[in-house]
């Protein structure tokens, strides 16, 4: 059995009120088009053809070389859109899935079941349908007394009886590929919309006494076509529920799953605990036994086993096992933390590698630095890495002790076991086993405070 796929992605999406093509709006971190394309992969199509139109280059860039593309210059209906794929698929033997690019909730399992139903029943066309409590706006499935599909009627063309029908057309179909393009040559624009309806091929097949079937979705949510921001929000809500449920089934604990935002490509190992209001985005991986507390935000990062991240932001960083971060820490892109590193409250790290068991507990900035293992970085330490034009590196050796309120002016190297005194400004190399003091001596002038305006004796 050879399968093909046509994805309809040419529309502007006027009701979205956006400069962005409709299919490029995101749901849980992926564009709607990407969600659809991933689901389509479940039928293993030999060839996928994406119909593009409005801002076509933007749409093409999302799928790149994963799909063939055809251009629909004028949007003259779904039938017209499918006609555009004729140059890619005409004459080929097999079954062709036609699906809209704005249906992000459709699953690969449902598409596979649709194809199997189509093949097993030897249909020339199979419609994916659903039962709607409120079918207004959808095309209705009209069956005869034997339950056979005889036609699909669009909302604007439906009579009073047809408008009461609850079974609706989801806009997804499977066709015998050759018969599809033969039938498309016979459809017209003689309807309320003045468009080429893809649904008209069903009546053509019926007139030729060819078999048309319908496969009913179990989950109505999968049929959702996103045409405005309201539907986009509904899709986001459903997708978030699916994602958190998947992770819970796989052994992840959520204290308040309704408040968590996790994107589609995030990976979470078993025995992770996630508190409320946590955001996980991009290609993030969370290792087993890790705890993410309330307010944590992580994007495109790898978090090792048994870490604790407390109300902190982590971007494009790698954390080994046993690392603790926060509260209120910020790990910026290019940060790597080895085993059992501790990054405490109000510490910012950027583009740096920090060795195992090193601690930076409070109020510190570490940028463009290579920090060894078992280093203590005192509160208020700053690596001065930027001169207004260029960035420079700071290197701190193993077991060094950086005193509180040290200012390290890069480029700079502090050797193994070296110490910088609290309050120092260090601008020259500190050799191994050395102590560097870069501050003025304290001068105490007894009694001088009485001369100052703030002293109580001055107010008499």
From Swiss-Prot:
Cofactor: Mg(2+)
Region spans: Pyrophosphorylase: 1-229
Active site, UniProt feature: 362
Gene3D superfamilies to which the protein is assigned, alphabetical: Hexapeptide repeat proteins, Spore Coat Polysaccharide Biosynthesis Protein SpsA, Chain A
Binding site for UDP-N-acetyl-alpha-D-glucosamine: 8-11, 22, 72, 77-78, 139, 154, 169, 227, 332, 350, 365, 376
Cofactor detail note: Binds 1 Mg(2+) ion per subunit.
Annotated spans, N-acetyltransferase: 251-460
Family to which the UniProt record says this protein belongs: In the N-terminal section; belongs to the N-acetylglucosamine-1-phosphate uridyltransferase family. In the C-terminal section; belongs to the transferase hexapeptide repeat family.
PANTHER family with a match to the protein in the record: BIFUNCTIONAL PROTEIN GLMU, NUCLEOTIDYL TRANSFERASE
SUBUNIT field: Homotrimer.
UniProt-recorded name of the protein: Bifunctional protein GlmU
